[in-house]
Amino acid sequence: MDTVLFVSPTLYCCGDTKNWQSQVPKPGYVPILKSDIPKFEQSLKQANSHRDHDKGNSVASKTNETDNSDEFKTSTSRYVDLKSFLPISLEQQLHTVCLAHFPLGLGSKGIDKVMDRLDNLIRKKLQVEDNETKFIKQWSYVDCVNTLTVYISFQESIVEEYGKAIQLLEKLFDNGSDGIGLHMDENTRRFVCDLTEGSPAKELDETAKDEFSALITMLRSEPGSISQEKGLAGNSAVEYNVDISTLSDLPSSSLDQLCKDIVEFRTRVITLEKEKRNKELAEEEKRRKQNLKHIFDRIKVTNGGSEKGSAPEAESDSEDSDDEVEGYDDEDADDYEAEKKRVQAERDAQEAQYESMVHSFQDSLLVQYSSLRQEYQRLQNYETHLQKNKGPMLKELLHLAMDPYHDHHRPYKESESKADEEDRKRESEEVPKKKATETEPETELELELEPETETETKLVSDADATTAAPKIKLALKKSIGKTKNEIEEEETPETDAFQQKLNLLRESGVVEELVKEYLGVYEPDLVSYIFENIEEHQSKQALETELTETFDEDSPVLVSRIWEAMEQ
């Protein structure tokens, strides 16, 4: 069982690392397990380090405020994000310019100081008495990998001073102070020209440019710059805090060195990963530049490479042609040049048309190929798809039969079905009549022969064999014909109705669905066997007996459902 110790966090934070643990309870001490002491000690160390760091930051911020208060008196930041900066009205667009190739590493505070310096310069050169006047309203920027593009929006209230301020900025960034250049759109340039038309331009000495360059250089080296912030962020990103609770099985004397080794190992892994990533990015950038170079070379070859590549041939041809052209008159030479240009233009047009036709043909061929390939795959798997989806397709056909859009020529169909029913009834009534007419001659023959036989029996009593035989045969034929006609007359309507129900059952596909439902697999042989059994025996009990071996106790339910579907 783990022992319990008593610790005093207050003594530990005050620096008394010897007496902060006790084995007996004391006032101000809290109980804790011995195995949890390293983790608790680490949390106290982190709390002390954060407290010391906060104190150092507060002292440094106070000293920086006192040091920078005399040198720069910056107001609140005029930076806004790019979405809020976008000009809405035409007046805002005319009062917006940008500084391209602005150096990295200044930070938002540094760019604010640059904006204040530009305001001071404009007020000084335009001799504005009010020191609180601000020409620059707000600014924003776009990161362009190696440089920044800073967008500046001036106050709309200034009209006359705006043109002079833009002239001062153009002169300030004329020679490319630290690579910075002033850019504006055509409407803004025309607006500035209209404002400054007829007024003398303000001169700007070199000292102002030098001071501005020195300001940018100084701001880039300040501790609050973007480069140093990125460095601090990169260093803080690889700091690790090892969980001591996972190392509770190890002795406390070796925990510090083990934690240092773990942090060093993980930091090394992160560093190697960063170096690998930077190397991949550099290679990718190099590859991208190489691809762009190849693209530009290809464009040069397609546009003017043929002319450069065939320079020697062109020179030799030109020398030969010069000798011929010298013999022509001036008019012939002009006609020759015009004809040559016309032929070249036709050739270029034909080549362009040929290229467009080739591209269109390739596109159409690709589309046809893809469509034919899809059609081939569909036809190749048609039987499998049809066999696999036979049940859902039959259900879909049943649903489509009840669809209102399927109800085309419904009255004609109903009239035809009624006519078919009447034909079936008439046919069933005519068949027994035909059979009865076929048996009528036999009965007449019997009626004619019977009196003769009776007279013969009266006259000749001994002739029994010769006269009895035809009489018996005729009577048998008559009785057999009557029984057959009666049976056919009785069974014909019933068999026709049963056969009609069986056909409807066969067309509905109910038997297929039930077999697939109870078996889990569609068996066409079993379905055909069920129909043959129903047609042959016309008995529910016989079908149930035959299906008992296949469906076991489900056969009565299956047969009853089949019979219900057939009786509907």
UniProtKB/Swiss-Prot annotation:
Residues 314-335, 439-454 have a biased composition (Acidic residues). Residues 260-359 form a coiled coil. Pfam families: PWI (PF01480), SNU71_N (PF24826), SNU71_RBD (PF24825). The keyword Repeat does not apply. Keywords: Coiled coil, Cytoplasm, mRNA processing, mRNA splicing, Nucleus, Ribonucleoprotein, RNA-binding, Spliceosome. One of its GO terms (cellular component) is spliceosomal complex. Its main location: cytoplasm. Residues 412-438 have a biased composition (Basic and acidic residues). GO terms for molecular function: RNA binding. It is found in: Cytoplasm; Nucleus. One of its GO terms (biological process) is mRNA processing. Residues 43-71, 299-335, 407-464 are annotated as: Disordered. Component of the U1 snRNP particle, which recognizes and binds the 5'-splice site of pre-mRNA. Together with other non-snRNP factors, U1 snRNP forms the spliceosomal commitment complex, that targets pre-mRNA to the splicing pathway. Belongs to the SNU71 family. This is U1 small nuclear ribonucleoprotein component SNU71. The lineage of its organism: Eukaryota, Fungi, Dikarya, Ascomycota, Saccharomycotina.
